[in-house]
């Protein structure tokens, strides 16, 4: 019935309403920090960590919105923010002129050292990307500039003496899997992050990556992972149905107590 009448106005209307429902159900492309679960995840981590001294890495810092929230929840933690584009890094520094708790590094992270071309979308600069969604509405009639930027890896920076992160957040518009690939030694070592947050969604399509690949790597390192919702993380084994490219955040942890907090069990 539905297949045979998919062009009819009532059936099309039902499909539109169902898609709206599913977007909300999946917490898809919802960026209000205090309502999409990101604030909840930080609060859970802060509660679990107690008063211990923490190192936090914010990879893909943009203007520092996530770093500010992490600092508010964990004022004694030191946050290192990585912002690959020099113009955006300058704005980040201008917003935090005297922040002793914050170190800003104008460098990108990837799976190898070198240089990459980054598309700076001046009209929508939260969509800046190494592999941009160039056919999306965000890039239609936009003021774009390509900038060559240096990149390193998490493992390389730690080998050079950077303190390893207790909490690692990655939001780099589709390059997230490459950043995590560059931390394989960290993830399997004695100083692996207690919690990892990374963005997953249709930004991964131009980059040619799958959650299946990254999930397998994290699972091999002993992590459990799941999608972040406003008041819980749904930890579960990966299934092909999870490869839906709906924008959102994935949380990965190894500690059972932290997992229980994030699952909304306490």
Specify the residue positions occupied by each region the protein language model found:
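Phosphate/nucleotide-binding beta-alpha loop and adjacent structural elements of enzyme active sites
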Residues: 1-266
